[in-house]
């Protein structure tokens, strides 16, 4: 149960993390997220006026902090495509938690623009960064991002980010059977002794455009089996309650890896994350079918108290645990799930 005064949902799960999508656009067309046959030249992305402004985002974050949020992650789409993203980072970096501590302010990126923006992001107050990287082999990486983008450019961005101090830097690899699962060991080998934490994520049924099927999932247990065949691994305890990754370290001290088993070992029971979409809708689950329109309140003249009360009401009524129900075979039929590119991963 959360500490006294923290906002909790129907299962006692505290509101602690807020993921904010700052754009629905991306310069990649990854096959599991924004497949090119759907997100083509005719796809209607949001207009700038539909996006939350930086001032609106800052106001929202202040209100979420009042309810106990301590960690903010900026996502997309690709967040580095949002013009002047450094200014938003600077605005949010000035804020403190309810306990007077600096916010844990992070960002997830595909790394394509990271080399040119890393220093400015660090100077603006970004704490650290997570990079999505689904292969170390260039041909495989180009096929996964489907825009013929070279892996060397992302690796350069990672090096620059690490050099300017956006650390500990994490890398997320979504593992899809038959597409990039042959990259598990090579990616691990590349980042051993680098100080970078590599995490392997089970391919998820987020949205409906990626044509997900269970047969394409490589279970985390299989990922660990393959890694253990190449390197001696030792389990690590969680850093904090509700951590999504199961942590492991190399026995020779070469670093840390993790697996995120969102399909085979769902962690809904201690999920503390809310998501704010690009146009200001509050989603309580990555697999949600609908959100609560907070932008309408902001632009309709609602007071901070009215918006804060809306956040409280929505979170306290939260019952979401889709992944646990999916795993047990009892997930009810749902409507059209929101796409990952709209609310971030």
Curated annotation (Swiss-Prot):
Oligomeric form and interacting partners: Monomer and homodimer.
SUPFAM superfamilies: Radical SAM enzymes (SSF102114)
Lineage: Bacteria, Pseudomonadati, Pseudomonadota, Betaproteobacteria, Burkholderiales
PANTHER family: MOLYBDENUM COFACTOR BIOSYNTHESIS PROTEIN 1, MOLYBDOPTERIN COFACTOR SYNTHESIS PROTEIN A
Enzyme Commission numbers on file: 4.1.99.22
Name of this protein: GTP 3',8-cyclase
Positions annotated to bind GTP: 19, 73, 108, 170, 273-275
Pathway assigned in UniProt: Cofactor biosynthesis; molybdopterin biosynthesis
Binding of [4Fe-4S] cluster 1, residues: 26, 30, 33
